Amino acid sequence: MSGGTAATTAGSKVTFKITLTSDPKLPFKVLSVPESTPFTAVLKFAAEEFKVPAATSAIITNDGVGVNPAQPAGNIFLKHGSELRLIPRDRVGH
């Protein structure tokens, strides 16, 4: 699991650093959301920020483990840490 240096829990919020792996420059966004936010909403927002299609994108950990977005953001944070990667579908499996 990732170290929590970029993550802070202020009140009931969790912070994620999401990196776009399909761009060689590896741009990232730091998002803070309430723990109860559905992670599907976090995925959709991050994909829109990177201008990639949310419906065909996946979130993985830095270790390459897929993340099931059908759970609250707080659960994702506890299980996988704060550093995640966004992969557009055309890159999944590459």
From Swiss-Prot:
Functional description taken from the UniProt entry: Ubiquitin-like modifier which can be covalently attached via an isopeptide bond to substrate proteins as a monomer or a lysine-linked polymer. The so-called ufmylation requires the ufm-1-activating E1 enzyme uba-5, the ufm-1-conjugating E2 enzyme ufc-1, and probably the ufm-1-ligase E3 enzyme ufl-1.
A GO cellular component annotation in the UniProt record: cytoplasm
Entry keyword annotation includes Ubl conjugation: yes
Taxonomic lineage of the native organism: Eukaryota, Metazoa, Ecdysozoa, Nematoda, Chromadorea
Tissue: Expressed in the intestine and head neurons.
Identification of the protein by name: Ubiquitin-fold modifier 1
Keywords: Isopeptide bond, Ubl conjugation, Ubl conjugation pathway
Organism: Caenorhabditis elegans
Biological process (GO), any one: reticulophagy
Cross-link type Glycyl lysine isopeptide (Lys-Gly) (interchain with G-Cter in UFM1), residue numbers: 79
